[in-house]
């Protein structure tokens, strides 16, 4: 079985198990990393639909996380495919924003729901005013486009406090939990 398809199927199976055990609720989302190769697989949409239906998972419980590297090739076909998946109800996050070929045009043209700020920005937040300014600007632009913002790599309470003061209320990192 292709690893990418296995990840989607296993994620849906995991959600079903957690829902049945009362550990997960239908208003929660699970982020699933999708590689550029997996995204460009012609069978992705059918596999996603099949897995969601097989495990009786609402599409809005999954957030597909893609990186900026996905956008290098054939931007228009990427946008079209993202729109089709989003029309099913599945959400999209751009992961590690700022680490690749960052372009504000992505935020304007892509059907995104979430922007995840790369950990390199977050790690230097307290010690570098330029980084603080960039994070503040990224958050302001994200809000303008109606995107939720997730700060990746939060490892210290001091950084968490700065992020809260900037209006960021979603975080990920060792301060909360190690990756699963």
Regions found by a protein language model. Give the residues of each.
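Catalytic core of bacterial c-di-GMP phosphodiesterases, primarily the EAL and HD-GYP domains
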Residues: 1-77, 153
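Conserved functional hotspot residues or short segments at active or partner-binding sites
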Residues: 81
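EAL-family c-di-GMP phosphodiesterase catalytic domain
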Residues: 23, 35-42, 61-76, 88-180
């Amino acid at each position: 079985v292709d690893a990418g398809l296995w990840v989607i199927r296993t994620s849906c199976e995991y959600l079903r198990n957690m829902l049945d055990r009362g550990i997960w609720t239908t208003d929660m989302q699970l982020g699933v990393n999708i590689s550029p190769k997996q995204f460009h697989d012609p069978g992705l949409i059918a596999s996603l639909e099949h897995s969601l239906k097989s495990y009786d998972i609402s599409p809005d419980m999954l957030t597909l996380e893609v990186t900026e590297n996905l956008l290098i090739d054939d931007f228009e076909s990427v946008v079209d495919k993202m729109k089709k998946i989003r029309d099913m109800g599945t959400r999209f996050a751009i992961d590690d924003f700022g680490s690749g070929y960052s372009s504000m045009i992505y935020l304007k043209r892509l059907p995104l729901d979430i922007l995840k700020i790369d950990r390199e920005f977050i790690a230097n937040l307290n010690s570098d005013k330029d980084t603080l300014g960039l994070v503040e600007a990224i958050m302001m632009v994200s809000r303008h486009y109606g995107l939720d913002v997730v700060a990746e790599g939060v490892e210290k309470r001091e950084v968490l406090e700065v992020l809260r003061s900037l209006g960021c209320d979603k975080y990920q990192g060792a301060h909360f939990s190690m990756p699963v």
